[in-house]
Regions:
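C-terminal beta-signal and adjacent terminal beta-strands/loops
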Residues: 552, 609, 614, 741-792
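Surface-exposed extracellular loop regions of Gram-negative outer-membrane beta-barrel proteins
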Residues: 339, 380-384, 438-440, 445, ...
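Gram-negative outer-membrane beta-barrel transporters
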Residues: 480-487, 495, 599-608, 628-724
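Short acidic/polar hinge/loop motifs at secondary-structure boundaries
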Residues: 183, 200-227
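Outer membrane beta-barrel strand-and-loop segments of large Gram-negative receptors
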Residues: 310, 318, 408-417, 462, ...
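Extracytoplasmic beta-strand/coil segments of soluble accessory domains associated
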Residues: 158, 162-201, 221
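Periplasm-facing N-terminal accessory domains of Gram-negative outer-membrane beta-barrel systems
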Residues: 28-123, 163, 168, 186
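Transmembrane beta-barrel wall of Gram-negative outer-membrane proteins
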Residues: 263-291, 301-341, 350-371, 422-426, ...
Length: 792
């Protein structure tokens, strides 16, 4: 196996050639740059020992440094000016101070950090859309710090989220299965959580699906998760909360290169470099490539000749140009190319995605005098897929049932102005954004009566699509009228317009084609999303927080306009769908009775209304069956008819008994049940659960770090009972993952990651209940071995 691994790593290394050359150029050119530097050491106030893994950052231009084993850091190539330097570390109180830098100089800024929060030690931006200590916000927030991201056994950005118990993901890894990937928070159901990468939406334009592969782990600085409805700041889709990924800012001259491989022919290579160009102009270059590591999804007890290994190839190429002439303003332009090619478990089935994203931004000013942030983005995606029907009799053969192409395009922008300590407020923000979506679903259906004379013949073609414009504006005021009390008030108004709905389906007959063309009317809707949050510091060790919010989600293009036709059924578009909405309440506490242990917990309840779901139409239904349904037996459309309630709680604990050891754990219980369409006599205990919401969930994480032995991390995950999308119950499961990494020589570390150490066999899907059901299984034991070279 070792010789095979070396061979694969050598093959993957070829993708790094150009970026390596750029890195060498960066190292040589950096010497001639005229910018200033900030360097220093971060130490423990009690023991005076250096702190490893502290995050030292400035906001404009964006720079981040992580302290090494000696607690040292360097922020390189800064334009002359005054900066607010923020330092954070787990178990330490965040530090913020101003530092002035002149051209060509190096300023020393040593930081002595006092003991602080174990669970809320970071400075975050997603909870209020401006920097604030996590321990001050009136929300339930969870942060994966740069060190936690680096030490995680997870291979994918999606899998990083699995250790946050309130985040619900499909059991299927994003490395296998289809491209339509989703996420949920607190049982709000799929597709109703905002996901952002550097402040720009990741949810795609057609179905709000997420390509986790376009956020490779090697690019990440940190992850912030805000739980509960956040539409008052983020607008559409943030019914369950917001997940924000932040890329690692690369200083000119910085670089990382990673090569790894492992189980089932897995190969991965990545490189990133900060390249000085001229004066205040620099570039960030990132390349990431991976393939292999897949497996046969079908339980071997039921697998047949048609079942093969599900595989994926993912490619990322990223370029960012940065211009930072002063400490008061900076600008950037980015281009990002992403490709995902996969088979989905049989020889004929596949799903491919290609994306091109272009972003630009401008930051001006400072939070103390007024900080303006402008963003614009443009994204294009083309997806191609083929689905198959498995013939009866032992899964021995398959036939193409559908091929589809799904082109989509979205573009938009945002503006935000924030000022701190003004008008008797701690912070005041106003902003707005706009996003345009357009897309089509073009499918070709084939006859699957096989074997037979019509097997494989064209059954019909269906093309449907439309466009949507969505805009909103928000305002936020944060006040601390008395020292222990902090009040967060925010509100937002959104409007969306559904336009250009259309469909065309063509069914061939023996003599001609039957064509049905339809145009759909335009519609407009609005939503109002307020939020009130309170945090009260009852004692120095105990704080309480509570919040009330309303949130919404506009229907996406797939829900509005996708038309589906078969010989026995039809699903017709509904361009007049209303918004889904949520009304939620939560209350929680943060308690740190002694310096080395902390607890936090939250109770929440949220009512979700107007969920749109496919609904059968009949002559007596409301609305009644229209003429568009034709003569088929079953006619459906999406209607806003479902209601649900999510009620539950979560608890977190962190223990930091010695500097080298950090332990944390969490548990989430979510009772999420349907509230509408129930038969008479249904009680609270017999109301059906919302599908694909596991409960309970538990995680335990332990990390031991030392200069001699390196970093050792173990992660325990348990998911309780859940259901498939079709409502079939899945058994609970438990897995343990681990990661070990150690510096080999200065600037080079080796690592070994193992997912599912016990090779636990667990269900990720089940076609039907009982013995006839065919189970898909989760990822078996997966070992990866690699090396990373770095210069921060």
């Amino acid at each position: 196996m070792m010789s095979s691994l070396v061979r694969h790593l050598a093959r993957v290394a070829s993708i790094a050639g150009l970026a390596t050359a750029l890195t060498l150029v960066a190292a040589s050119v950096a010497i001639a740059q005229k910018g200033g530097n900030i360097r220093g050491t971060v130490t423990n106030a009690q023991t005076h020992a250096p702190i490893l893994g502290a995050r030292v950052a400035i906001a404009n231009p964006e720079r981040v440094a992580i302290t090494d084993d000696h607690g040292t850091y360097v922020l390189r190539e800064l334009p002359a000016g005054t900066y607010v330097v923020m330092t954070s570390a787990i178990g330490r109180k965040p530090d913020s101070s101003s530092v002035s830098v002149s051209a060509g100089s190096t300023v020393t800024r040593d930081v002595v950090m006092k003991e602080g929060s174990l669970l809320l030690s970071s400075v975050i931006v997603s909870a209020t859309r401006s920097p604030v200590e996590a321990s001050k916000v009136a929300s339930t927030v969870n942060v994966l710090t740069p060190e936690q991201v680096r030490q995680s056994p997870a291979r994918e950005s999606q899998d990083l989220l699995r250790e946050i118990s309130a985040v619900e993901l499909p059991r299927t890894s994003s490395l296998v299965g289809g491209t339509a990937q989703i996420v949920s928070i607190r049982g709000v159901d799929e597709g109703r959580t905002a996901v952002l990468f550097d402040g720009i939406p990741v949810n795609d334009a057609w179905g709000e699906w997420i390509d986790w592969g376009r956020i490779p782990k090697v690019m990440l600085d940190r992850v912030e998760v805000v739980e509960g409805g956040t539409s008052s700041l983020y607008g559409n889709g943030a019914m369950g909360g917001a997940i924000s990924f932040f890329s690692r800012p690369l200083s000119p001259g910085a670089m990382t290169m990673t090569l790894d491989g492992g189980s089932r022919d897995a190969r991965h290579g990545a490189i990133s470099a900060g390249v000085p160009i001229y004066g205040a102009l620099s570039a960030n270059v990132v390349g990431d490539y991976q393939q292999g590591g897949g497996y046969n999804l079908i339980d071997p007890a039921k697998a047949g000749a048609v079942d093969v290994v599900s595989q994926v190839i993912q490619r990322n190429a990223y370029l960012r140009l940065n211009y930072a002439p002063s400490a008061n303003w900076s600008a950037f332009v980015t281009g990002h190319e992403f490709g995902d090619s996969r088979n989905t478990g049989t020889p004929l089935s596949f799903a491919n995605r290609d994306q091109q994203n272009f972003d630009l931004g401008l930051n001006y000013g400072a939070y103390t005098t007024g900080f303006l942030s402008l963003r614009a983005f443009d994204g294009r995606q083309t997806e191609a897929q083929r689905s198959t029907a498995i013939r009866a009799g032992g899964r021995a053969a398959e036939d193409s049932s559908l091929t589809a192409t799904i082109p989509s395009h979205d573009w938009g922008g945002s503006a935000q102005w924030t000022r701190s300590n003004t008008w008797m407020l701690e912070s005041f923000s106003v902003g707005g954004d706009f996003r345009h979506y357009q897309g089509d679903f073009n499918e070709v259906d084939f006859n699957t009566t096989c074997p037979g004379v019509n097997c494989g013949k064209l059954a019909r073609t269906v093309s449907s699509g439309g466009s949507q414009n969505l805009s909103g504006a928000f305002i936020q005021a944060i006040a601390a009228p008395i020292a222990p009390l902090r009040i967060e008030l925010s509100a937002r108004v959104d409007r969306w317009d559904n336009n250009n709905g259309h469909s065309l389906d063509v069914t061939p007959t023996a003599t001609s084609n039957v064509t049905n063309t339809k145009s759909y009317g335009d519609s407009s809707k609005t939503a109002f999303s307020p939020r009130v949050g309170l945090r009260y510091q009852l004692f120095s060790s105990l704080s309480l927080h509570a919040a009330y919010y309303r949130a919404f989600r506009a229907p996406n293009l797939a829900e509005l306009y996708r038309k589906q036709v078969s010989s026995t059924s039809i699903t017709i578009p509904n361009p007049y769908l209303a918004a889904e909405n949520a009304e939620g309440r939560e209350a929680g506490f943060d308690w740190q009775p002694i310096d080395w242990i902390q607890f936090k917990g939250t109770w929440y309840v949220a009512d979700y209304n107007n969920f749109n779901v496919p609904t059968n139409l009949t002559a007596t239904s409301t609305p009644p069956r229209p003429a568009d349904c034709g003569t088929v037996t079953t006619c459906r459309t999406r209607l806003n008819v479902n209601k649900s309630r999510s009620e539950g709680g979560e608890a977190y604990v962190a223990v930091h008994p010695i500097q080298q050891l950090f332990l944390s754990g969490s548990v989430n219980y979510d009772d999420d049940r349907q509230q509408s369409g129930l038969p008479a006599g249904t009680t609270d205990n017999t109301k059906p659960h919302i599908n694909r919401v596991p409960s309970p969930k538990q995680t335990l994480r332990g990390t031991y770090s030392s200069a001699m032995f390196g970093d050792w991390t173990a992660l325990y995950r348990h998911e309780g009972h859940t259901t498939t999308l079709q409502g079939v119950w899945l058994d609970p499961f438990t897995v343990v993952d681990a990661n070990v990494q150690r510096e080999i020589v200065p600037g080079v570390r080796g690592f070994v990651s193992v997912e599912n150490i016990g090779d636990k066999k667990y269900q990720i899907n089940l076609s039907a209940a009982g013995p006839a059901g065919i189970a898909s299984i989760g990822m078996p034991r997966t070992v990866r071995v690699g090396v990373e070279a770095y210069r921060y």
